[in-house]
Amino acid sequence: MDDSSINKELKQKLNFSYCEEESESEGQEAWETRDAHSQIPDRAEGQESEAKFTPPGPPLSSVHEVGTFQEKTKKSPEQVLMTPVSGFRNYPETPAQPDSRSKLLDCESPFTPKGLLSQSVISSTEKIPSRGSKHLRFTPVPFVDEMTSSALVNINPFTPESYRKQFLKSNGKRKTRGDFEEAGPGEGNVEQGLPAKRCVLQETNMASRYEKEFLEVEKIGVGEFGTVYKCIKRLDGCVYAIKRSTKPFAGLSNENLALHEVYAHAVLGHHPHVVRYYSAWAEDDHMIIQNEYCNGGSLQTAISENTKSGNHFQEPKLKDILLQISLGLKYIHSSGMVHLDIKPSNIFICHKMQSDSPVVPEEIENEADWFLSANVMYKIGDLGHVTSISKPKVEEGDSRFLANEILQEDYQHLPKADIFALGLTIAVAAGAESLPTNGAAWHHIREGKLPDIPQKLSEEFYNLLKNMIHPDPRERPSAAALARSRVLRPSLGKAEELQQQLNLEKFKTATLERELREAQQAWFSQEERGDAGVSGTPTGSRSTKRLVGGKSAKSSSFTWGKSSP
């Protein structure tokens, strides 16, 4: 019986129909190799007959056996044939069984068991690293997720440039990963890839924070962009003003507009003449801002009540309002921002709550802490139109208080636009009629003419208001100048006069001390010259004897006086 017939019968038993031609050739090569190494050719026929009835080998029990066997088959056919297998001890010269196993592992036959096929794919590849902590730590996929999530962080446009660069600068601690090392040069573009993202404003499926944390008391205001509610926080029991945007976020531009006020509040921080900001979040596609509650309402409400009763704010109160709002504007302008919507409805009043403990007199005598003792505080609120002085993106406010240069899109003197609006606000608080929104009367005011005020104001105060609405913004006083104006702070003028007198007295004292030192130096120098002249005379030897003798005489009088007769 030849080799080909034996090989065909073995293939029929294994039902190996997909790789017949390949198995024939390989089987024949294996027999030729085996015959070359055999030392007893006489037994070949008997062994061939026994190979006809060789049963299939036992199934592989583990992935380890498959991988081990495959590694052996990959070395060389000779090594595979010469390796003794425990399942073939009775048939040491049977080549078909290991060859069939290699076919099961290497050929994707329709009759190949799926388990063996999948195991062969695994074993044919390189060693898979363990999914331990080290593998997870250095895989780039989670790091890509971190970079993606960091792109969802909003960049506050009002943050100072130096602080923003420091904030965006990487500290290099995460640069152990290869992908991040390659992406290192693009770190400077982080800011460009961090716009206001819509997902930053969206809440996940969770209970309403507004309903969970706050108890709504009443509605206290309605504006163009939102409604304000008086609420009590359930946790601390304090009262807050919660502002909810009227319109939902329909697009990215509306989101930026809604975030504008949050950005401004966050950068400004806390100031006694700016409404305090606590937190903000998005809920049901609406922006919600938690602010300080001002128990006195708005200045517009107070003006309306005065108009109904026929009263007006008197000049001392008007000066107080102007001074406090000027201090708030000074702080905003010094932070590199402008409000651009100063008007009575955006100025809020806080009445000081009476304390059970008496106020220590020393605490209110300091001029620098005068606002701590004020019974009424005036604060600037509604920062929805705030923009940067250096990079303005102007959103026009109320046209009744709008400066002409803003209408002409001249943004070179933006802080002076707030001064213009503040001057008209004080005029309205003084009793002026409702301001025009357009027309000849509107332009009449922009020419530097105050509206009619029913009460008599002092000349200096009236002129100050006129300067605040001067047609040329450069001629208007700054917020810092208003804060130190003697018209608004007479006591500050007296203090300055006293300070000047003190400085003059200090100068006089310093002059006298200098003259005294010069006189002392002249006297000492004269004494030194006198001593030098006496020691330099021609009869120096005689004078020396006399001086010595004189000294000796004096000493003898003290020493020998008692013993002399």
UniProtKB/Swiss-Prot annotation:
UniProt xrefs under SMART domains: S_TKc (SM00220)
Catalytic machinery residues: 341 (proton acceptor)
The enzyme's E.C. designation: 2.7.10.2
Domain Protein kinase: 214-492
UniProt-listed InterPro entries: CC_SR_Kinase, Kinase-like_dom_sf, Prot_kinase_dom, Protein_kinase_ATP_BS, Ser/Thr_kinase_AS, Wee1-like_protein_kinase
GO function terms (MF aspect): ATP binding; magnesium ion binding; non-membrane spanning protein tyrosine kinase activity
Phosphoserine found at: 76
Reaction(s) the record says it catalyses: L-tyrosyl-[protein] + ATP = O-phospho-L-tyrosyl-[protein] + ADP + H(+)
Biased composition (Polar residues): 553-565
Chain intervals for the UniProt region annotation (Disordered): 18-78, 169-191, 521-565
Span(s) of short sequence motif Nuclear export signal: 317-331
This protein's record includes keyword Transmembrane: no
Residues that hold Mg(2+) according to the record: 346, 382
Keyword Ligase: no
Biased composition range(s): Acidic residues: 19-29
Alphabetic keyword roster: ATP-binding, Coiled coil, Kinase, Magnesium, Meiosis, Metal-binding, Nucleotide-binding, Nucleus, Phosphoprotein, Transferase, Tyrosine-protein kinase
Compositionally skewed regions (Basic and acidic residues) per UniProt: 31-51
Residues reported in the UniProt entry to bind ATP: 220-228, 243
Gene3D superfamilies: Phosphorylase Kinase, domain 1, Transferase(Phosphotransferase) domain 1
Main location per the UniProt record: nucleus
GO cellular component: cytoplasm; nucleus
Places the protein is found: Nucleus
Pfam families: Pkinase
Function: Oocyte-specific protein tyrosine kinase that phosphorylates and inhibits CDK1 and acts as a key regulator of meiosis during both prophase I and metaphase II. Required to maintain meiotic arrest in oocytes during the germinal vesicle (GV) stage, a long period of quiescence at dictyate prophase I, by phosphorylating CDK1 at 'Tyr-15', leading to inhibit CDK1 activity and prevent meiotic reentry. Also required for metaphase II exit during egg activation by phosphorylating CDK1 at 'Tyr-15', to ensure exit from meiosis in oocytes and promote pronuclear formation.
Similarity section: Belongs to the protein kinase superfamily. Ser/Thr protein kinase family. WEE1 subfamily.
Name by which UniProt lists this protein: Wee1-like protein kinase 2
Organism: Ailuropoda melanoleuca
